[in-house]
């Protein structure tokens, strides 16, 4: 239920250039230690905000009932006060009172497959190659680019990011390389080898469902050049031509409990265990995909976004993955490329910073051809497939096929304007887009719904995310007034501006640690830890409605013309991600086909219309020049 974790909004960040590229030992620790600790907000403040957030999404009777429960919860000396004190004690003892709980509840205890339900896919711009040579050359350059970024992490010279003048926690950058999720029966874990005594020097390459260990550093510690990597990729490609191999990787796409059982039988065999260890330890994974069926240009982006998110099923590339791996870059022969990442380790922005760096790097011309030195043959990772494992693979194939058939995903490139228009109106582009989403949803369904937009808590040490609730009394007043003929246009403009400003104010509160969602989660988990009976406010209908996010959304801004995508977090909801560029906006919209009420193409259409109608409204009523 908590897979909504992920979706992180961060405004474009200012970067501090490192003063030198020498190893700055201890610089990372000093930076991290100086960050403020995540506060526990005052109890009454969070409960007031909770009641306010319920108004647009529950009935008056439900709200009145919840108000009673909230009043009981916060009586002097009552259960709320006791739990609040417990949280405050926890905050004094820990580096971050939330991060460990959040990692467990949002990710590691989440039992649905990571594919679609948790791990975001990233669709990158189509490259201009159309053959094997081009595919391998680009993959080699991409690998070189990631290693270039890794050197900044290793040397602690990564530019510190800022948000609103405040330095941000950089810890997630140290979690995304040489790391992997490991399935467990009730709870998964994450292993990270970046800081181990002997950090890994290899990556994993997958082709035709076959896994290889490719060393990307020479014995003297210098990285291979893209020319040298290209030669190694050719060797891998040539030694994995047979396409009838069992797709062991598809096991990682299954329900976490099923995968945990299959995993324990898989690694009983020493050969398998060593192969799995190699994948888990590798710096990252590169998937050399086979071409997908040709489709018309207008559905191409949606089709390829699916490849990045889930691999297209067992007949295509879903077996050409190890979905537990934190970073998997995907390069196909037809020029399509992207990535998929396992969400437990990090939110979108650090991933996007890496992607931006790598995509810039791939455009650099090769100035000198590097000398061709003899390089060892990349090591093929062997798997011994027992009948039991073969059976597990068959089940995983069937399951992913059902999941993919159920996913309705639509890419929309909104060409009419980008960040430029809201900025010209002195409005926040993110808030403008969120209010357009509210308008689109209201026009389809005639009501508001619980809406999740992630806010970054990286101003705080080890901060992850909190929730911006985009459905507000102000947004509801606007969406009702927008199509009401009795409301004059000038008043609609005022309602629109008020709604956008209210969203902006909520965002500012959230990034300063003053939103209520994670606080309520903390109180609930504190109750479980203290073995007290679950307080009534968490057993209430309003709470269930508030946590049923029909719109799960995320702004993930990038310099690269790309977009992230993920599945809805509820069966009757939408997953919406967007990257606002200067003059256009990239959207991905997902829904489930099994829900008759939701439809990704219809939502995309209504979203486009909402954005255009809001622009027209503002253009017809220009603000007086001050």
From Swiss-Prot:
Q: Which reaction does it catalyse?
A: (R)-carnitine + acetyl-CoA = O-acetyl-(R)-carnitine + CoA; propanoyl-CoA + (R)-carnitine = O-propanoyl-(R)-carnitine + CoA; butanoyl-CoA + (R)-carnitine = O-butanoyl-(R)-carnitine + CoA; hexanoyl-CoA + (R)-carnitine = O-hexanoyl-(R)-carnitine + CoA
Tissue and organ expression note: Expressed in flagella of epididymal sperm.
N6-acetyllysine: which positions carry it?
A: 261, 268
Q: Can you tell me which residues bind (R)-carnitine?
A: 452, 454, 465
Keyword Translocase in the entry? The reply is: no
Where does it localize? Endoplasmic reticulum; Peroxisome; Mitochondrion inner membrane
Q: How does it sit in the membrane?
A: Peripheral membrane protein
| MF-aspect GO terms | acyl-CoA oxidase activity; carnitine O-acetyltransferase activity; carnitine O-octanoyltransferase activity
Renumbered ranges of motif Microbody targeting signal: 624-626
Protein purpose = Catalyzes the reversible transfer of acyl groups from carnitine to coenzyme A (CoA) and regulates the acyl-CoA/CoA ratio. Also plays a crucial role in the transport of fatty acids for beta-oxidation. Responsible for the synthesis of short- and branched-chain acylcarnitines. Active towards some branched-chain amino acid oxidation pathway (BCAAO) intermediates. Trans-2-enoyl-CoAs and 2-methylacyl-CoAs are poor substrates.
What is the protein named? Answer: Carnitine O-acetyltransferase
